Amino acid sequence: MKTMIGVIGGSGVYEIDGLEDAVWTKVETPWGDPSDEILTGRLDGVPMAFLPRHGRGHVHSPTTVPYRANIDALKRLGVTDLVSVSACGSFREEMAPGDFVIVDQFIDRSFARAKSFFGSGCVAHVSLAHPTCGRLSALCAEAARATGVTVHEGGTYLCMEGPQFSTLAESLLYKSWGCHVIGMTNMPEAKLAREAEICYASVAMVTDYDSWHPHHGEVDITAIIATLGTNADHARGLVAGLPARLGTERDLCPHGCDRALDHALMTAPAKRDPELLAKLDAVAGRVLKG
């Protein structure tokens, strides 16, 4: 199988340096328009697609990001390995601003977003016990360390709806739950990537201590913006290190991410809604054709 790397860039990461034959491409999906056109090209010989999650100019809030269209569009382009890069707050003293956390678990507290490609007319249940790809996450950690940034492998990401930051009570609650970082965008993104059978890794770039820390007070947007710049530089270095680690060819995912739908479809073929099936052509075409 040919490798194609996808990158969804969050706050502060709006482009990828060094892409050859780079072109912004409009991708149409049955779920509406993605956040923006998608920058495609090659990096060190490996095909790559970059999508700014909030759109160029930061036009989408965490709630209005078209998550389904974004994942569908990347799947249509042939993305096999998808890396999410996003800003986050930290609940742990040791996970300091400027550090990267390679997320391996989520608690989803978002509530105003469509969270599945499936539904009435074609029901499917995929496993999210391990919502990120262990293989891809390990390679991201390796590439991040090569940039000199401090990397923490493993951590639980609390996804809040936003766009406001947490209250002090919320921040203390989430910390007491054992969460490591907090952000607004990785859900339902990770869920949809699993439904689309795309290997997904989440690189959470710490910008602040949320509002729980007694010596840092409430979230300071000015300080966040300053940290975003440094984090973005390291993120670009991480992405630059991925082609050499992933290569141009890939085997089946050892964790089964690319076969997540093998036993997931529940609706009998004769009862499936043709209109929904038509919308699932990219996401679930492998199993629907079978």
Swiss-Prot record:
<feature type="site" description="Important for substrate specificity">
    <location>
        <position position="166"/>
    </location>
</feature>
<feature type="binding site">
    <location>
        <position position="185"/>
    </location>
    <ligand>
        <name>phosphate</name>
    </ligand>
</feature>
<dbReference type="InterPro" id="IPR035994">
    <property type="entry name" value="Nucleoside_phosphorylase_sf"/>
</dbReference>
<dbReference type="GO" id="GO:0006166">
    <property type="term" value="P:purine ribonucleoside salvage"/>
</dbReference>
<feature type="binding site">
    <location>
        <position position="11"/>
    </location>
    <ligand>
        <name>phosphate</name>
    </ligand>
</feature>
<feature type="binding site">
    <location>
        <begin position="208"/>
        <end position="210"/>
    </location>
    <ligand>
        <name>substrate</name>
    </ligand>
</feature>
<keyword id="KW-0328">Glycosyltransferase</keyword>
<dbReference type="InterPro" id="IPR010044">
    <property type="entry name" value="MTAP"/>
</dbReference>
<comment type="pathway">
    <text>Amino-acid biosynthesis; L-methionine biosynthesis via salvage pathway; S-methyl-5-thio-alpha-D-ribose 1-phosphate from S-methyl-5'-thioadenosine (phosphorylase route): step 1/1.</text>
</comment>
<dbReference type="GO" id="GO:0019509">
    <property type="term" value="P:L-methionine salvage from methylthioadenosine"/>
</dbReference>
<dbReference type="GO" id="GO:0005829">
    <property type="term" value="C:cytosol"/>
</dbReference>
<feature type="site" description="Important for substrate specificity">
    <location>
        <position position="221"/>
    </location>
</feature>
<feature type="binding site">
    <location>
        <position position="184"/>
    </location>
    <ligand>
        <name>substrate</name>
    </ligand>
</feature>
<dbReference type="GO" id="GO:0017061">
    <property type="term" value="F:S-methyl-5-thioadenosine phosphorylase activity"/>
</dbReference>
<dbReference type="InterPro" id="IPR000845">
    <property type="entry name" value="Nucleoside_phosphorylase_d"/>
</dbReference>
<protein>
    <recommendedName>
        <fullName>S-methyl-5'-thioadenosine phosphorylase</fullName>
        <ecNumber>2.4.2.28</ecNumber>
    </recommendedName>
</protein>
<feature type="binding site">
    <location>
        <begin position="86"/>
        <end position="87"/>
    </location>
    <ligand>
        <name>phosphate</name>
    </ligand>
</feature>
<comment type="subunit">
    <text>Homohexamer. Dimer of a homotrimer.</text>
</comment>
<feature type="binding site">
    <location>
        <begin position="53"/>
        <end position="54"/>
    </location>
    <ligand>
        <name>phosphate</name>
    </ligand>
</feature>
<keyword id="KW-0660">Purine salvage</keyword>
<keyword id="KW-0808">Transferase</keyword>
<comment type="function">
    <text>Catalyzes the reversible phosphorylation of S-methyl-5'-thioadenosine (MTA) to adenine and 5-methylthioribose-1-phosphate. Involved in the breakdown of MTA, a major by-product of polyamine biosynthesis. Responsible for the first step in the methionine salvage pathway after MTA has been generated from S-adenosylmethionine. Has broad substrate specificity with 6-aminopurine nucleosides as preferred substrates.</text>
</comment>
<comment type="similarity">
    <text>Belongs to the PNP/MTAP phosphorylase family. MTAP subfamily.</text>
</comment>
<dbReference type="Pfam" id="PF01048">
    <property type="entry name" value="PNP_UDP_1"/>
</dbReference>
